[in-house]
Amino acid sequence: MQYDLLIKNGYAVDYASAREGYFDVAVQNGMIAAVESSIGGSAVRELDASGKLVLPGLVDSHVHASAWLGGSYAHRMLAKAGVTSALDMSGPGTSVLELAREYGTGLNLATIEYVRPGHTVSSDDPSSAELQQLITKVQRQGSLGIKLLGGHYPLTVAATARAIRAAAELGAYTAFHAGTAAHGSNIEGLLEAVELADGNPLHLAHINAYCRGTVLPEAEETELALKALAANPNISCESYLSPLNG
């Protein structure tokens, strides 16, 4: 059989099947066709991956690839890290598209739009109607939903709850850098975010950023965060991989 691509002699890791080892990988019509210890046949293109890892493309659910955050190098950096699909976690969506046209590397890239007083909403206490209008607008423009930038541009507690609820009603994705006018980006802000979600879907960004020991010892804050997540399956999250992070 002739494949489109045959990758030979690499150390392959398949997270879905928990299989890893030295395997050949065959690709046909853009899909993995076979993973075997040795694959015969020919291919339009053959790569020797000796001494290299062969990994599935990474899905990064929190990146920045706009002119506001991330900049023109974002696409190249993601591709070099092995990312194939990503969610830009603030927008503006129009800027993400512009950079993709100019500097794109073939990523599957989705966006959500920031909720920022004086820019996308009128104040730090937008009404439900204003939030619904924003969400509908960005959905029509192609974004999946909204990002609450509580750690940088916090809304009032009530407006934060309204935003999460409005997004849920409109079927929009909501991500939240925890923090409101009442609580900062710490364990208190995290627990407040869980409460404000009120059972609605919510992506709580970089969970470990709120467990740095600013209120309680780090271990206690981490335990509180883990318990809160376990008790609220409506909330998803990711974490920083580096000990030095924003």
Question: Could you describe each region identified by the protein language model?
Answer:
Residues 14, 62, 90-91, 150, ...:
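Residues that line or immediately flank small-molecule/substrate-binding pockets and catalytic motifs
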Residues 128-145, 154-246:
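Histidine/acidic residue-rich metal-binding segments in metalloenzymes
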